[in-house]
């Protein structure tokens, strides 16, 4: 009897130390989106890296469909914008939909009967491209329905049964418009017109957000480049939506390979002209934090009439064009001003399956607990030390010396904190690009501890068989922990076990940081596109949120400064002739403290 009781007691202890605390129904998400991401072919030593960009989402018959550049060679379908399933085109339309097993920046739109797809083919010898459509995209059944002129970065917009195309890419192409017959797809004679002229000289740019193509990369401060920007922007990725009888035409600038990649919006009462660039631009900007970039976007409505933006975010580790997909809420206020909510846009956001206020679901309170925390690992490659998995930077990473099961990474959170969710951003280190597709999955276990010695398993993904490069785990109930540990079970494509960052979200049981004092702004009088902000250091802050906008009630721009020691920032993205208003907020592991707005 004594032996039986001992066995029962031991089994109870083991079960209490090996709970799987993953939420059964995920209600939050965290950028970048946790997709499997296709293996884009790049001219690098590794030859391949995960990537996707230039996204389009359409809602069709109650389901969402996601199309992205240089990804899986197909598309994805979802019921809730969280869980996605891969779908592939039927073989009959491969020649129409794909170039070398992928497609680039397609035009996708839906009406009540069909989803339409037009590829941006890279074959410059082609004068026309096919239009394909599907009444059953969930099962990958498509057919050809017409042809249109070859376009760079096309956008198809359907309005009251009429079909319009917008296109243009690069410093030598304007944003151009034309209409097609909705049945034959023949171009309507005389409908073609230029909506926005291209830029030939960077000095003619009225707004500084046009600066920095292949000059700025992941810097958040433009001091080293003031007066030196020379490259013309690469405007691209037109997108059009209609709200309250107004048309909103977006395009991306200055170029996709940087954190400053953003969207600009123009408004008009007409679908085919009269578009005016808005003083609150850029309409979509995400600079600072773990990952940046918010350009070449698609704005769409969900099932509950909420607006969203799906967008391109920049990584650039194995190739300049290595990118990810982000999702942000969008709003239109009573004045018709469009706003993309990107503040702390790589922190957890709620995704309620109902009508919501974007201010309530973004940056809603689960704060980062892992920034610059002490760490250790089972092994580390030279140059890829463990601290690079806690630095809040998608462009650095830790790598173990092998991909063997049992390699691990441990983070000391410095104190006991509440943990609500964890984002595990896996890196690709020394992969074998020719490894079988069946090897492309992540498997791991996650543990917590209060002393760094006695571990309790909270997540068991040892039997996982799919790729989860930006795994986001929402816990069913919050846990308290002082340490967190991830242990490798399997790494994709024979690579080494590696992490871009292990990010822990919850509450740090600290006081919120203090208020920023003595904020001052010096607008450059010789070049109003620049302004220098300075403020006093705030102890207890993990960083600062530099907010600004053209009206004190519309501070829609934000640059995240991830270091409490940094107390100045040179902005370069302002517009000549526009007066700005500024505020600097502080944040830490327990919340955000709003600053005081000052005006020029």
Question: Model regions: which residues?
Answer:
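Aromatic, loop-rich ligand-recognition surfaces of beta-strand-rich domains
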Residues: 391-459, 469-515
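Pro/Thr/Ser/Gly-rich low-complexity, intrinsically disordered linker/stalk tracts
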Residues: 505-540, 576, 590-600
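Beta-strand-rich modules
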Residues: 571-592
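Short, flexible loop/turn segments at beta-strand junctions in immunoglobulin-like
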Residues: 474-478, 537, 570-575
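Extracellular low-complexity, O-glycosylation-prone stalks/linkers
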Residues: 447-448, 540-561
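Short S/T/G- and acidic-enriched coil/turn segments that sit immediately N-terminal to beta-strands
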Residues: 264, 442, 471-472, 565-570
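Beta-rich carbohydrate-recognition and catalytic domains
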Residues: 20-230, 242-289, 304, 312-357, ...
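Short beta-strand segments within Ig-like beta-sandwich modules, predominantly Fibronectin type-III
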Residues: 462-466, 559-566
């Amino acid at each position: 009897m004594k032996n039986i009781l001992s066995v029962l007691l031991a089994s109870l202890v083991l079960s209490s130390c090996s709970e799987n605390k993953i939420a059964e129904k995920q209600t939050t998400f965290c950028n970048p989106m946790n997709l499997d991401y296709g293996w884009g072919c790049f001219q690098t030593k590794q030859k391949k890296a995960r990537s996707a960009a230039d996204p389009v989402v359409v809602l069709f018959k109650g389901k969402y469909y996601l199309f992205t550049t240089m990804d899986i060679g197909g598309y994805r379908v979802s019921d809730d914008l969280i869980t996605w399933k891969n779908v592939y085109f039927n073989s009959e339309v491969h020649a129409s939909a794909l170039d070398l097993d992928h497609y680039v920046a397609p035009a996708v739109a839906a009406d009540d009967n069909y989803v339409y797809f037009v590829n941006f083919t890279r074959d410059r010898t082609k004068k026309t491209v096919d239009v394909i459509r599907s009444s059953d995209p969930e099962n990958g059944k498509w057919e050809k329905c017409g042809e249109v002129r070859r376009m760079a970065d096309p956008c198809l917009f359907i309005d009251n049964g009429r079909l319009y195309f917008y296109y243009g890419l690069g410093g030598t192409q304007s944003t151009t418009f034309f209409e097609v017959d909705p049945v034959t797809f023949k171009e309507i004679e005389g409908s073609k017109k230029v909506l926005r002229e291209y830029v030939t000289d960077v000095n003619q740019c009225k707004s500084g957000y046009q600066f920095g193509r292949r000059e700025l990369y992941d810097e958040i401060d433009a001091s080293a480049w003031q007066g030196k920007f020379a490259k013309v922007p690469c405007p691209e990725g037109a997108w059009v939506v209609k709200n309250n009888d107004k048309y909103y035409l977006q395009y991306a600038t200055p170029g996709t390979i940087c954190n400053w990649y953003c969207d600009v919006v123009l408004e008009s009462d007409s679908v085919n002209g009269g578009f005016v660039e808005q003083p609150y631009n850029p309409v979509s900007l995400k600079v600072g934090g773990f990952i940046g970039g918010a350009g070449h976007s698609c704005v769409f409505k969900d099932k509950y009439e909420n607006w969203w933006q799906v967008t391109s975010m920049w990584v650039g580790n194995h190739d300049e064009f290595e990118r990810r997909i982000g999702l942000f809420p969008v709003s239109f206020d009573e004045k018709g001003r469009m706003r993309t909510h990107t503040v702390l846009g790589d922190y957890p956001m709620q995704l309620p399956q109902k009508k919501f206020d974007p201010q309530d679901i973004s940056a809603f309170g689960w704060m980062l607990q892992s920034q610059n925390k002490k760490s250790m690992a089972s092994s580390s490659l030279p140059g890829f030390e463990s601290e690079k998995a806690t630095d809040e930077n998608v462009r650095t990473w830790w790598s173990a010396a092998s991909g063997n099961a049992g390699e691990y990474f441990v983070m000391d959170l410095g104190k006991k904190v509440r943990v609500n969710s964890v984002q595990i951003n896996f890196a690709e280190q020394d992969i074998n690009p020719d490894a079988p597709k069946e090897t492309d999955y992540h498997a791991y276990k996650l543990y917590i501890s209060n002393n760094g010695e006695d571990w309790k398993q909270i997540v068991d993904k040892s039997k996982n068989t799919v790729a989860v490069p930006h795994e986001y785990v929402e816990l069913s109930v919050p846990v308290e922990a002082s340490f967190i540990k991830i242990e490798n079970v399997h790494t994709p494509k024979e690579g080494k076990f590696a992490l871009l960052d292990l990010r822990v979200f919850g509450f740090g049981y600290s006081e919120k940081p203090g208020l920023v004092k003595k904020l001052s702004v010096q607008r450059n009088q010789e070049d109003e596109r620049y302004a220098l902000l300075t403020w006093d250091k705030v102890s207890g802050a993990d960083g600062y949120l530099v907010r600004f906008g053209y009206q004190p009630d519309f501070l829609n721009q934000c640059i995240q400064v991830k270091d409490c020691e940094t107390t100045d920032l040179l902005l370069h993205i302002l517009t000549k002739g526009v007066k700005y208003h500024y505020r600097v907020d502080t944040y830490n592991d327990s919340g955000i403290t709003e600053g005081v707005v000052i005006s020029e």
